[in-house]
Amino acid sequence: MADPGVCCFITKILCAHGGRMTLEELLGEIRLPEAQLYELLETAGPDRFVLLETGGQAGITRSVVATTRARVCRRKYCQRPCDSLHLCKLNLLGRCHYAQSQRNLCKYSHDVLSEQNFQILKNHELSGLNQEELACLLVQSDPFFLPEICKSYKGEGRKQTCGQPQPCERLHICEHFTRGNCSYLNCLRSHNLMDRKVLTIMREHGLSPDVVQNIQDICNNKHARRNPPGTRAAHPHRRGGAHRDRSKSRDRFLHNSLEFLSPVVSPLGSGPPSPDVTSCKDSLEDVSVDVTQKFKYLGTHDRAQLSPVSSKAAGVQGPSQMRASQEFSEDGNLDDIFSRNRSDSSSSRASAAKVAQRNEAVAMKMGMEVKGKKEAPDIDRVPFLNSYIDGVTMEKASVSGIPGKKFTANDLENLLLLNDTWKNVAKPQDLQTTGRITDSGQDKAFLQNKYGGNPVWASASTHNAPNGSSQIMDETPNVSKSSTSGFAIKPAIAGGKEAVYSGVQSPRSQVLAVPGEATTPVQSNRLPQSPLSSSSHRAAASGSPGKNSTHTSVSPAIESSRMTSDPDEYLLRYILNPLFRMDNHGPKEICQDHLYKGCQQSHCDRSHFHLPYRWQMFVYTTWRDFQDMESIEQAYCDPHVELILIENHQINFQKMTCDSYPIRRLSTPSYEEKPLSAVFATKWIWYWKNEFNEYIQYGNESPGHTSSDINSAYLESFFQSCPRGVLPFQAGSQKYELSFQGMIQTNIASKTQRHVVRRPVFVSSNDVEQKRRGPE
């Protein structure tokens, strides 16, 4: 039996680092020999620590995810003996509307460490955790913290996935999977928590992709333990057997992802389910066995098993071709913007005129004024220049970057042809893959699928992970001033963006089968013939990639040789890699020195841009600049404007999204944070919303309301020092509390709550030039 005190200490360390660490990082915090620590984690079991092994070019990387069997009681009033924690989950996450002084009004307990809760934590050997660490552990272990799951969700591959009005705002995932009691390896309901739509709902409920990934890996582990490899074959009388054509779930599009389970789980490891092993036998013989040798176990008796599938096993003939091509357009709400080739391989050999037509159709029609529609009060229509801008160049090299490579219309032509072929070639039918970042047709057209789903040429930026577990990556390169435009393409290429959502932590991986055959000449000389191993990296939600990340880098010489040997192939492999992170890894601030007189640092870690703000959208695997940033910024600076319409696409400043795709705003540091170097610092104004839906600046008077004893400068200063705090203040005889985390102002006496927003002061490009010249 593992020592309870040591296990509690290890859990405490893991939760202090986001709930997940590599074994090497954990060894740096605990003075134990590696063999002893690994044995302790194995002895504690997968109900305490989920052990994952990630294969990459540098070898095997082992990581540990903290979990627990402790649960929060779901009853509002529990009168019977209960072994669950009794607390307010929103308060645990810092999001309860009731402030600490009004906690008696909440129907759930705010006393996290009450005598009863402490005894329960002690029974689960968690008594040493503080509130923040306990919150981290429970969020990724207890399904009670997930958003509501749709009760009428019927599964994928049906004409109607659920009976709710569309779009459904609930999670379309298997509820039994989240609880660890799903008995179906080929479950009709999705096991993919990393699906784009699922992630969008998760973010709206405060769960970052990093946390969701941890939940995915824990659920994968439970599912694999409940359904060991010996029970893969589905019973023919249950759900109609495992017919290969019965399911069209998007999260089964690519199946060749690995799960490296704890040796306690399975001595043979676990691969993805294969409904029809015999049908793939011939194809598997074509796959090189050398790849499997890279996933050697360390200190165990196990070997991780690869299940690669060549293009012959992908089901590329007949109706399945057309079905694979058409499945991506299930949601097709962007069909009016992008033209997609739905024909077979012969039609993909388009003439130059057809290719030019298609490239022209790819460009988004921006800036066309919409007429005949009544303007909503909170919507501002911003004129954008037409289409995209060509020739975006990366300034900085990174593991997932392409230094000095420009996207051109010709590149996109090849990319589109490759996409069409891949849709027809690489779709294994009815293969259950959990934790996959999926895509749909319109995503592929608009953002080259925001969360991917295309083949992964496992380069330095791809990941290998358990049972389909995959990770979103984000490398934030600087973009040259000449390419400050746009969604970043001319009539052919979409640029990229990431959300203000913070993100991911820790290694996870994915190795996908690469088709050995192509259906068009264009693909045949560009597709790699065998999957490469991959590395992983992870950054904390706080944006500090070092401490909480394990980054297996590739030397510049190797990366350069790959690019120079076949730059087009390298470009396509880079673009088609769907594993990117939606966190704040990379530059988070704009360099004021660059704005003023030029930055003298040779390796500046801040973004060099000609404006003190920078609006970007995540496309492919990089952040790309919007075209008319001043118009977006001017609208954002007005607290009354919540939406900007770009033709039929809207930017939502509350959710920081363009349609459902994330956006972000980089800026210079706050004026209150760095007042001594404040020439180009961002000045923030704080507003509260009155009963007439008018935003009133703090410190200003409004009809029927006395001005408060605080102003924007005071609020900003307090916010910079304590961004999750609660600030008490007074306006006349009324006393209030302002919650920075919830951006809510609460009247202590009447309990009335008001919405609070924080917006910058608008600075135009002319203002920047004037400040740069100085006073005349």
UniProtKB/Swiss-Prot annotation:
Cellular localisation: Cytoplasm; Nucleus
Query: Please, one GO biological process term?
Result: response to virus
Record PTM N-acetylalanine, positions in chain: A2
- According to the UniProt record, where is the region N-terminal domain? 2-254
Cite the WWE domain residue spans from the record: 671-758
- Domain description: The N-terminal domain is sufficient to bind to viral RNAs and promote their degradation. The second and fourth zinc fingers are involved in binding to specific viral RNAs. Contains a divergent PARP homology ADP-ribosyltransferase domain which lacks the structural requirements for NAD[+] binding. It is therefore inactive.
Any idea which residues bear Phosphotyrosine here?
Answer: Y501
Post-translational modification as stated in the protein's UniProt record: Phosphorylation at Ser-274 is essential for sequential phosphorylation of Ser-270, Ser-266, Ser-262 and Ser-257 by GSK3-beta. Phosphorylation by GSK3-beta enhances its antiviral activity.
Q: Which residues carry this modification: Phosphothreonine?
A: T278
* Annotated Polar residues bias: 318-327, 459-483
* Species this chain originates from: Rattus norvegicus (Rat)
Q: Does the keyword Repressor apply?
A: no
Phosphoserine-modified residues are: S257, S262, S266, S270, S274, S283, S325, S351, S398, S544, S667
Lineage, opening ranks: Eukaryota, Metazoa, Chordata, Craniata, Vertebrata
Biased-composition ranges, Low complexity, are 344-353, 523-546
In terms of PROSITE patterns, this protein maps to:
WWE, ZF_C3H1
Report residue spans for region: Binding to EXOSC5.
224-254
| Recorded GO MF terms | identical protein binding; RNA binding; zinc ion binding
Q: What induces it?
A: By type I interferon (IFN) and viruses.
- Tissue note: Expressed in the kidney and liver.
| Gene that this sequence comes from | Zc3hav1
**Which InterPro entries does the UniProt entry name for this protein?**
ARTD-AVP, WH-like_DNA-bd_sf, WWE_dom, WWE_dom_sf, ZAP_HTH, Znf-CCCH_8, Znf_CCCH
Q: What is this protein called?
A: Zinc finger CCCH-type antiviral protein 1
Q: Where is this motif: Nuclear localization signal?
A: 69-76, 405-406
* Primary role: Antiviral protein which inhibits the replication of viruses by recruiting the cellular RNA degradation machineries to degrade the viral mRNAs. Binds to a ZAP-responsive element (ZRE) present in the target viral mRNA, recruits cellular poly(A)-specific ribonuclease PARN to remove the poly(A) tail, and the 3'-5' exoribonuclease complex exosome to degrade the RNA body from the 3'-end. It also recruits the decapping complex DCP1-DCP2 through RNA helicase p72 (DDX17) to remove the cap structure of the viral mRNA to initiate its degradation from the 5'-end.
Give the family per the record: Belongs to the ARTD/PARP family.
Oligomer status and interactors: Homodimer or homooligomer. Homooligomerization is essential for its antiviral activity. Interacts with EXOSC5. Interacts with EXOSC3, EXOSC7, DCP2 and DCP1A. Interacts with PARN in an RNA-independent manner. Interacts with XRN1 in an RNA-dependent manner. Interacts (via N-terminal domain) with DHX30 (via N-terminus) in an RNA-independent manner. Interacts (via N-terminal domain) with DDX17 in an RNA-independent manner.
Which GO cellular component terms, listed alphabetically, does the Swiss-Prot or TrEMBL entry include? cytoplasm; nucleus
